[in-house]
C-alpha cells in the first residue's frame, strides 16, 4: 500500500457483511456498495428469508439488476439457517457456487430473525456438513434469553454457544460477525485459524454514550448495540495491531426514516456511503494506516479462500459533507454520519 499524506491507495476492498434489502430499497442502496466494493457478503434476512438455492439465485439477480453500468460487483450469497433447513440443499448451493456461506441468527436476535435457530443442537447435522465442506458459518453472536441484559448478550454467547460449538466442530470455519466487546476481541485473538471477525465502522467510532447522552440518536442504534468505551477501545486496538483475522464488514442496514425515528425504532445503520472513509479515519487516529489495506482488502479473501481483487481504490483527504437524507420512493434514508463531515473520501 502507498500512503502519502493526502492519498491512500489500496486494493479494491470487499464488504464481508451487508444488508441490501429488496424492492425499491434495494434499488436505492445497491449502488453505494457496488461503486466501491468488488464483492459483498449479502445477508439473507429478507421478510421471506433466503433458505433455498432457487431463492438465492433469484435474489442475486435482483441485486445484479440494480448494479449501475460500469460497476464491477459480485454479490456473494448466504443461506439463512433454520431449524428445518435441509443439509442437502445447503450443500447443493455451495457446490453450485450459489451459497458462499451460511448465516446463523439466534431466533429474534435482530431484524427479520424470527425464523432463526432456536438452538445449535437443532442444526447440528447441517453444521457438521458445513465443516466437511469447508463452508464458512457466519454468526450473529448474541443470546436472546429474556433474562440476559442486552449489553451482556455477546459475552454470554461466547461462553454458552460459541465456545461449545467450536469445541465440538473443531475445523468449522466461523466468522464472529460485528463484534462489539473486549470479550469478543480477546476471544477471536486467542482463537485459531478457523475463527475470524468482522467489525463495523460504528463500533470503532462510537460507544453507547454517543447514542444516549444528550438525547437519543436513533441512527446510531444497531444490533449488537453500542457498548461501553472500554469495549470500543478494545476493538480499535485489535484492528490497529494488524491482526489478520479481522476484516471489514460494514453491517450496513438501511431502514426508512419513519422506521428509525419512531417510538419503537428499527436497529441498523446505513453506513455504505461513508464506511470506507470512516474506517480510514479510525486507522489514521490509531496510527495504523499501515494495516488499513489488509483489513479492507486482504484479510477477508485470505480467510474465505478467495482471490484478492485486481482493481484499486484511492481515498483522498478531501472533506466531504454526508447528506442529511437520501430519497426513497415514498420516504427517505438517513445515512450514518448524516450532516457531518468526513475527512477521507473515495476518489471518483
Swiss-Prot record:
Q: What InterPro entries does the entry give? A: Amidohydro-rel, DHOdimr, Dihydroorotase_CS, Metal_Hydrolase
Query: Where do the catalytic residues lie?
Result: 251
Extract one GO BP annotation from the record.
'de novo' pyrimidine nucleobase biosynthetic process
Q: Which cofactor does it need?
A: Zn(2+)
Q: Which residues carry this modification: N6-carboxylysine?
A: 103
GO cellular component terms, alphabetically, are: cytosol
Can you state which reaction this protein catalyses?
(S)-dihydroorotate + H2O = N-carbamoyl-L-aspartate + H(+)
- Give a yes or no for keyword Coiled coil in this entry: no
Binding note for cofactor: Binds 2 Zn(2+) ions per subunit.
Q: Which UniProt keywords apply?
A: Hydrolase, Metal-binding, Pyrimidine biosynthesis, Zinc
Q: What is its EC number?
A: 3.5.2.3
Pfam families referenced in this protein's UniProt entry, alphabetically: Amidohydro_1 (PF01979)
Residues reported to bind Zn(2+) 2: 103, 140, 178
Q: In which pathway does it act?
A: Pyrimidine metabolism; UMP biosynthesis via de novo pathway; (S)-dihydroorotate from bicarbonate: step 3/3
Q: Which family does it belong to?
A: Belongs to the metallo-dependent hydrolases superfamily. DHOase family. Class II DHOase subfamily.
Q: What is this protein called?
A: Dihydroorotase
Per the UniProt record, the source organism is: Salmonella newport (strain SL254)
Amino acid at each position: 500500500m502507498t500512503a502519502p499524506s493526502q492519498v491512500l491507495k489500496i486494493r479494491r476492498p470487499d464488504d464481508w457483511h451487508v444488508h441490501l434489502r429488496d424492492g425499491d430499497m434495494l434499488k436505492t442502496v445497491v449502488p453505494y456498495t457496488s461503486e466501491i466494493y468488488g464483492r459483498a457478503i449479502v445477508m439473507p434476512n429478507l421478510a421471506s428469508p433466503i433458505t433455498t438455492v432457487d431463492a438465492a439465485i433469484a435474489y442475486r439477480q435482483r441485486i445484479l439488476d440494480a448494479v449501475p453500468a460500469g460497476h464491477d460487483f459480485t454479490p456473494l450469497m448466504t443461506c439463512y439457517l433454520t431449524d428445518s433447513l435441509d443439509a442437502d440443499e445447503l450443500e447443493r448451493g455451495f457446490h453450485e457456487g450459489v451459497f458462499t456461506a451460511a448465516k446463523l441468527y439466534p431466533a429474534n436476535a435482530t431484524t427479520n430473525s424470527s425464523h432463526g435457530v432456536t438452538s445449535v443442537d437443532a442444526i447440528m447435522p447441517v453444521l457438521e456438513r458445513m465443516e466437511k465442506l469447508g463452508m464458512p458459518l457466519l454468526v450473529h453472536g448474541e443470546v436472546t434469553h429474556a433474562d440476559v441484559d442486552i449489553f451482556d448478550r455477546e459475552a454470554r454467547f461466547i461462553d454458552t454457544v460459541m465456545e461449545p460449538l467450536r469445541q465440538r466442530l473443531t475445523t468449522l470455519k466461523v466468522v464472529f460477525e460485528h463484534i462489539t466487546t473486549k470479550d469478543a476481541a480477546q476471544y477471536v485473538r486467542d482463537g485459531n485459524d478457523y475463527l475470524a471477525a468482522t467489525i463495523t465502522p460504528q463500533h470503532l467510532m462510537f460507544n453507547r454514550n454517543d447514542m444516549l447522552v444528550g438525547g437519543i440518536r436513533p441512527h446510531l442504534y444497531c444490533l449488537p448495540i453500542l457498548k461501553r468505551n472500554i469495549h470500543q477501545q478494545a476493538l480499535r486496538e485489535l484492528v490497529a495491531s494488524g491482526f489478520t483475522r479481522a476484516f471489514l464488514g460494514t453491517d450496513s442496514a438501511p431502514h426508512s426514516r419513519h422506521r428509525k425515528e419512531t417510538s419503537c425504532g428499527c436497529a441498523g445503520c446505513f453506513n455504505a456511503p461513508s464506511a470506507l472513509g470512516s474506517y480510514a479515519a479510525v486507522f489514521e487516529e490509531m496510527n495504523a494506516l499501515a494495516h488499513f489495506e489488509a483489513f479492507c482488502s486482504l484479510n477477508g479473501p485470505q480467510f474465505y479462500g478467495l482471490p484478492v481483487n485486481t482493481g484499486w481504490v484511492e481515498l483522498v483527504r478531501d472533506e466531504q459533507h454526508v447528506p442529511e437524507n437520501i430519497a426513497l420512493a415514498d420516504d427517505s434514508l438517513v445515512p450514518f454520519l448524516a450532516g457531518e463531515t468526513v475527512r477521507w473520501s473515495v476518489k471518483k
